[in-house]
Amino acid sequence: SFRLSLSASTYAQRGSFTTPEHDFTLFPHRNHSVTSESRIPSEQTLKSLTDIPGNWRKNWLNVYYFWRSNGLNNAHQWMLDNFNKYGPIYREKIAYYESINIINPADAVIMNKSEGPFPKRIEMAPWVAYRDLRKENYGVQLLNGENWKRTRLILNNSIFAQSSIQRLVPLFNEVVLDFVSMVHKEVEKSRSDYWKTDLTNDLFKLALEVICYILYGERLDLLQRKYNKAPQKFIDSIATMFHSTPIMLYVPPSLLKSINSKIWQQHVGSWDNIFEHADTYLKKAYRQFQQGSKNEHAFPGVLTELLLQGALPFEDIRASIIDVMSGAIDTTSTTVHWMMYELAKHPHIQKNVRSEIMEAHQKTEGDPVKMLKSVPLLKCVVKETLRLYPVAISIQRYLNEDTVLQNYHIPAGTLVQLGLYAMGRNPKIFKNPEQYNPERWLKGEDTHFRHLGFGFGPRQCIGRRIAETQMVLLMIHMLQNFKIETDPMTEVKSKFSLILIPDKPINLKFTPIK
């Protein structure tokens, strides 16, 4: 997924969410709509913002508690523990960061209906600070209001439309087949009948190869197993940028900048590298566009198509292209790695998914566009993986209007967070939540507003269709070609680094299927 946002390993208390004051209720609605009657209880029952439970009065003491619990690496667990302690809604303030936190799908529906015409998320203060420092334009990730809506609609109507994604499937397929070929070559080089490895960096290279092919219409040949310093520097800088962001959501970047702290230096340096590397592709594609030298039979790339449209000036296009490029690497790669890990841990599920793929291949004669429409269980693997390992552990919105959540009156302008990680592991929302079971998405369980790994509404992940297509196509080909295994005794848990990542290397064994 390309969506990046803030703020959840296992339930500390898997039993009840009930507290003396708050009973965890899902408020089901038969037609899944939220009427004004269901949103606005009588004045007699309505409570105020100050009545919401939570540790929000001692905000600076909370900083100490947050640090002591290693909150920067365990924000997902911190959030989960708070839901267990306070119930389905709690209020929190840590330093300057204040939010109302919710977990119910029905409350997520209300939150969605209250986001207004220009949905606004938490401001990524360090990213804004960097762009202000370097006098860079804001891209679609950081824009708000009318400017955001205008830019988003232009992007939505280009590459990110469903019709455009189908046009790009051959490009995805080409890169994915090269990746599969690379794995086969590694098996041959290993002089055994399998290859055992941590795929992290190879998946990063795959994601960079795909997104650059789409954005610039050009292959980088990153899957040739040759060390290439510039792309690797870009990949490493993305990781550093993510890692250095969380602390500056609680401590103002201006303070860290004023003392020239190491974390600020790392953050600025990583963004400098990201912009520098992206500019090499952007400027080359821009020159080709001006010279009209692009091969008219090849896919020209999103950049060229946006330039041809002329709806946005180049600097605005550049800003959003860099947003998309920087958000497409770790996010999609990490989700794919979690998928492989879970399928390796559950060989019976892997076998069923492989059978579905083989049957689809036979029916469609291997046509990738048709195959993408013929693998419902594999698509449920994506959903189930994002349930347990959401890229972003929460979705945030500043409410556009006064809203009622759990009988509390929440004023317009309040930041509300929906805890995705906590929701995915809640037994009152998902039956046997610790069990990896993709078929739950096929078997009649209520899934309304439960698959939110890409967000919701007009501000959901802009690259959702690209990410889903890339992940499903990759898994189609990998499971056709390889049996995936892992050490059953090694348990990998989650760590928060702005996105949710593995806390240790995921070592997998790939054995070619004869």
UniProtKB/Swiss-Prot annotation:
Pfam families: p450. It catalyses: 6 reduced [adrenodoxin] + cholesterol + 3 O2 + 6 H(+) = 4-methylpentanal + pregnenolone + 6 oxidized [adrenodoxin] + 4 H2O. Heme binds at residue 461. Its cofactor is heme. CDD domains: CYP11A1 (cd20643). GO terms for biological process: C21-steroid hormone biosynthetic process; cellular response to peptide hormone stimulus; cholesterol metabolic process; cortisol metabolic process; glucocorticoid biosynthetic process. Catalyzes the side-chain cleavage reaction of cholesterol to pregnenolone, the precursor of most steroid hormones. It comes from the Eukaryota. Keywords: Cholesterol metabolism, Heme, Iron, Lipid metabolism, Membrane, Metal-binding, Mitochondrion, Mitochondrion inner membrane, Monooxygenase, Oxidoreductase, Steroid metabolism, Steroidogenesis, Sterol metabolism, Transit peptide. It is found in: Mitochondrion inner membrane. One of its GO terms (cellular component) is mitochondrial inner membrane. Its EC number is 1.14.15.6. Belongs to the cytochrome P450 family. InterPro entries: CYP11_CYP27_families (IPR050479), Cyt_P450 (IPR001128), Cyt_P450_CS (IPR017972), Cyt_P450_E_grp-I (IPR002401), Cyt_P450_sf (IPR036396). Residues 1-39 form a transit peptide. It is a peripheral membrane protein. The keyword Mitochondrion applies. One of its GO terms (molecular function) is iron ion binding. This is Cholesterol side-chain cleavage enzyme, mitochondrial. Pathway: Lipid metabolism; C21-steroid hormone metabolism.
